[in-house]
């Protein structure tokens, strides 16, 4: 969409150099045209089921409201292309992207604040989902349209063959991982199975992303809030150190994690589970359709993560609708955000076995069992509600995730490194990151 006017030169500067602090919502007085078509970007593979789901949602929105929407799916270099459009003073009107991107986009001045008074369905949104769209200063810059949390996938046939119970503690978890590694659960007479599938690559911070399910359950943390939106590093607390050491022992001592994990992102890790090389996998619900087809629904089960030293907290994630600065159709932006979190929008996003944009509903009036009767989805929904935790909405979560991923990866790759020394180095790096973002505790 072409802009007749663009307010806020700081938006352009921040998009180019990525160093600006947050500013007020830009583009608020751009000349408005409520009939202008909306340009929507969604971070998903072009031509894939995610794009089809977004198109389906946009079509339902058009039918319900009369606003026109053009959907563009981009996966590779999404953030770079968004910055290029900012430099051209021509951002899309709406972006559907990961909830963790809020801080970065807000700090670059790319977003406008959302007035919840104009989003009537916001009152029906799940509280923690709504909170995930708030910036450090408590203002709303994103609205959730989909949620998810991690559950434990187990090769049910392996577990039953070895006469093991579903793990209820970390000790049970470790014992099952060892049994799957050493007791030939597939019965082929070869030592070719491993207990746990784990994507521990440094790329996009995968190692940190995966490990958070264990760190938080142990009572540890990457960074902790100290009040007034400030944070301090937390990887050298006793809880964090114990969590790292316990997880590290899975790879270095009992050797129950698949070989090559430290170089693997999610695609090759997914393959180890569906190919019968690993027996447990901590992951969200988005892989159920794939594993049902490739592995077989009867071969694996979905259960909550066992309780760690503190509790069973797992990573909560999801997608958010972001209203971009400089739009000439702010009424249309608001209408789309409202529709996306409405009961109708949520059910539309959940429809079908593939190509859905909504994993777990964020509208409290939507009963997942009525839309998806498969009980595994209810398990995921209960985990999200009871144990899900989002990463904090700091100005930029990416460097925290990336830096911690590099340390976790190094500790898993080199079993000779000293755990406490590496975590002490990590805390110093995290302190610098927090200081750079202006949120370090004094």
PLM features per residue range, with description:
Residues 160, 386-442:
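Conserved C-terminal helix/tail region of periplasmic/extracytoplasmic solute-binding proteins
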């Amino acid at each position: 969409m072409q802009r007749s006017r663009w307010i806020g030169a700081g938006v352009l500067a921040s998009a180019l150099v990525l160093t600006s602090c947050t500013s007020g919502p830009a583009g608020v007085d751009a000349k408005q045209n409520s009939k202008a078509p909306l340009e929507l970007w969604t971070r998903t593979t072009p031509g894939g089921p995610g794009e089809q789901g977004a198109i389906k949602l946009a079509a339902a929105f058009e039918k319900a409201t009369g606003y026109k929407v053009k959907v563009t799916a981009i996966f590779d270099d999404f953030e770079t292309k968004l910055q290029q459009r900012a430099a051209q003073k021509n951002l899309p009107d709406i972006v559907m992207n990961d909830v963790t991107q809020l801080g970065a986009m807000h700090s670059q001045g790319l977003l406008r604040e959302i007035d919840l008074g104009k989003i009537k369905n916001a009152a029906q949104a799940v509280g923690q989902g709504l909170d995930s769209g708030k910036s450090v200063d408590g203002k709303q810059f994103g609205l959730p349209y989909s949620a998810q949390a991690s559950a434990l996938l187990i090769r049910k046939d392996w577990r039953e063959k070895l006469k093991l119970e579903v793990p209820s503690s970390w000790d049970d978890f470790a014992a099952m991982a060892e049994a799957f590694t050493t007791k030939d659960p597939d019965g082929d007479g070869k030592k070719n199975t491993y207990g746990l599938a784990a994507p521990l690559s440094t790329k996009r911070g995968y190692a940190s992303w995966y490990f958070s399910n264990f760190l938080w359950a142990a009572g540890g943390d990457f960074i902790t809030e100290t009040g007034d939106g400030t944070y301090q590093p937390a990887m050298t607390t006793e809880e964090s150190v114990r969590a790292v050491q316990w997880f590290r022992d899975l790879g270095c001592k009992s050797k129950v994690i698949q070989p090559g994990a430290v170089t693997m992102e999610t695609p090759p890790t997914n393959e180890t589970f569906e190919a019968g090389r690993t027996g447990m996998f901590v992951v969200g619900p988005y892989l159920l359709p794939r594993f049902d087809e490739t592995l077989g629904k009867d071969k694996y089960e979905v259960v909550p993560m066992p309780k760690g030293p503190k509790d069973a907290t797992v990573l909560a994630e999801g997608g958010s609708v972001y209203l971009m600065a400089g739009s000439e159709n702010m009424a249309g932006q608001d209408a789309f955000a409202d529709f996306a979190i409405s009961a109708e929008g949520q059910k539309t996003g959940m429809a079908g076995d593939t190509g859905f944009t909504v994993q777990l509903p964020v509208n409290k009036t939507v009963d997942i069992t009525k839309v998806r009767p498969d009980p595994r989805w209810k398990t995921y929904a209960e985990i999200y509600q009871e144990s899900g935790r989002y990463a904090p909405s700091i100005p930029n979560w990416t460097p925290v995730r990336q830096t911690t991923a590099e340390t976790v990866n190094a500790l898993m790759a080199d079993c000779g490194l000293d755990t406490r020394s590496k975590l002490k180095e990590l805390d110093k790096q995290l302190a610098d990151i927090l200081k750079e973002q202006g949120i370090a505790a004094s």
